A protein has these predicted regions:
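Short loop/turn microsegments at loop-to-beta-strand junctions
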Residues: 68-69
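Basic, flexible linker segments flanking DNA-binding modules
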Residues: 1-47
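Glycine-centered loop/turn motifs
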Residues: 45, 49, 53, 161-162
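Acidic/histidine-rich, metal-coordinating catalytic segments
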Residues: 106-121, 139
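Two-metal-ion RNase H-like nuclease active-site motif
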Residues: 52-62
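Mobile genetic element proteins and their domesticated derivatives, centered on retroelements
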Residues: 58, 72, 78, 97, ...
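Active-site beta-loop-alpha junctions of metal-dependent nucleic acid enzymes
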Residues: 61-65, 82-106
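Charged alpha-helix within mobile-element recombinases
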Residues: 102, 123-133, 137-177
Length: 177
């Protein structure tokens, strides 16, 4: 017999699926960014793309879900900076952001990021450098379209499923050039 089998009961016939009931997962426990600046709070000049120094950032994950690359893209010029992260955690990301800001000096005014847990230490970087961080709406990747498009282009060199353990900073610099 194919399909669900009927069961007789006092109320009527019910069909029992072989897959059973859908189980619901527990709520996310990965933490939330409290007091973050929303992307809608960015100055209007950022949206118009008339002024240099406004960046979008994200991480490109490797197959092992540990090693990844931090990408920062300037919104007007499309200039790309890539930093290798040994682990996808907030300490590594904050260090990489600080190195990128030092490398770019006064050319960074704002950075717009997604809500990943790796960016939860943004306040430390904000206190150390004259940069303001903004965060996109969760699951609205198109709000950082320049960065998402660039990450797609980076995937030509670092395809999905590739282990990034053996990628080093020199490789990242060569891809970004």
């Amino acid at each position: 017999m194919t399909g669900p089998r009927p069961i007789e009961c006092p109320v009527g016939r019910f069909f029992v699926s072989k897959f059973g009931r859908k189980r619901r997962g527990s709520p996310a426990t990965r933490g939330r960014l409290v007091g973050k600046r929303h992307i809608s709070e960015r100055p209007a000049v950022v949206q118009r793309r008339r002024q240099l120094g406004h960046w979008e950032g994200d991480t490109v994950m490797g197959a092992d879900q540990r090693h990844c690359v931090l990408t920062l893209v300037e919104r007007v010029t499309g200039y790309l900076v890539m930093k290798k992260l040994v682990a996808r955690n907030k300490e590594q990301a904050a260090t990489a952001l600080a190195r990128a800001i030092e490398q770019l000096q006064e050319r960074v005014r704002t950075i717009t990021l997604d809500n990943g847990t790796e960016f939860h230490d943004y306040e430390k970087v904000e206190q150390a450098y004259p940069v303001k961080f903004y965060f996109a709406t969760p699951y609205h990747s198109w709000e950082r379209g320049t960065n998402e498009n660039t990450n797609g282009l980076i995937r030509q060199y670092l395809p999905k499923g590739m282990c990034m353990r053996h990628i080093n900073q020199a490789d990242c610099d060569a891809i970004a050039a």
